[in-house]
């Protein structure tokens, strides 16, 4: 089973990962999670690349103690990842991919449907209520909120798993499959040293990124780190320190009452 991770870049609270684990257990086959960062999106720059690669470091820590074979991959030539996706799908039972409504992840999901030699299953991890549940569009935020208030209890009882990796059976390693797929696609793997250097958001990290065809004018933000572990820390701080007054303070920037999650 291949989980091609494009938008829900986390190892917890992720419906797509939950589904991929179910499939791997059902078929007793290795689960390979490929977290890909492509060059082809319009705003590819040093800041976004650094932020995403910091998340890859977090995910590697979370996945390494599980049977998941985790593959962080950074594209070095445009459209390179398409051949890699096709290579991974060749002998796969299924490809699971994030279902995201706009932009690059949506385009990648559509390409996957066209390229893959196996079943492609798109899974929505954008929120508690599936995007397609309303079966209609909303002309105002107010009407959407009313729908949420009326229907959220229908979905909140089945949240994604907070620790899905414990549910994965010992399905074996997919490392040999990964090596073969990269060779067949004639695509270089991404060295862990490169990801680590970039994630440090230092001069060395910017030098490492200089070889990529992206916008180097938009620099990383040194005091803001990406990744799911940082996100969980920020969420915890918001819940413990600001949630009770959020409804009052959020519209007064000088009070510092925002969520800090945007």
List the model feature ranges, each with a label.
Residues 137-262:
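Glycine/tryptophan-enriched, flexible segments
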Residues 1-172:
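Trp/Phe/Arg-rich N-terminal binding region typifying the photolyase-homology
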């Amino acid at each position: 089973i291949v989980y091609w991770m494009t938008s829900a870049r986390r190892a917890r609270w992720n419906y797509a990962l939950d589904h991929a684990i179910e499939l791997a257990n059902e078929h007793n086959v290795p689960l390979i999670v490929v977290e890909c960062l492509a060059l082809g999106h319009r705003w590819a720059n040093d800041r976004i690349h650094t932020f995403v690669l910091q998340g890859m470091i977090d995910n590697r820590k979370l996945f390494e103690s599980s049977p998941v074979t985790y593959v962080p991959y950074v594209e070095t030539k445009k459209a390179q990842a398409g051949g890699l996706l096709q290579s991974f799908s060749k002998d796969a039972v299924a490809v699971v991919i994030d279902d995201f409504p706009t932009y690059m992840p949506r385009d990648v999901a559509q390409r996957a449907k066209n390229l893959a030699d196996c079943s492609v299953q798109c899974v929505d991890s954008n929120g508690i209520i599936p995007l397609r549940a309303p079966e209609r569009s909303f002309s105002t935020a107010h009407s959407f909120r009313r729908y949420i208030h009326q229907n959220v209890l229908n979905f909140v009882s089945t949240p994604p798993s907070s620790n899905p990796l414990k549910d994965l059976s010992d399905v074996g390693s997919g490392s040999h499959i990964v090596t073969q797929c990269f060779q067949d696609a004639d695509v270089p793997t991404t060295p862990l040293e490169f990801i680590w250097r970039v994630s440090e958001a230092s001069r060395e990290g910017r030098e490492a990124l200089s070889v990529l065809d992206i916008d180097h004018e938009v620099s990383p933000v040194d005091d803001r780190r990406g990744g799911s572990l940082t996100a969980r820390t920020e969420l915890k701080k918001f819940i413990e320190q600001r949630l009770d007054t959020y409804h009052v303070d959020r519209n007064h920037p000088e009070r510092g009452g925002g969520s800090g999650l945007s």
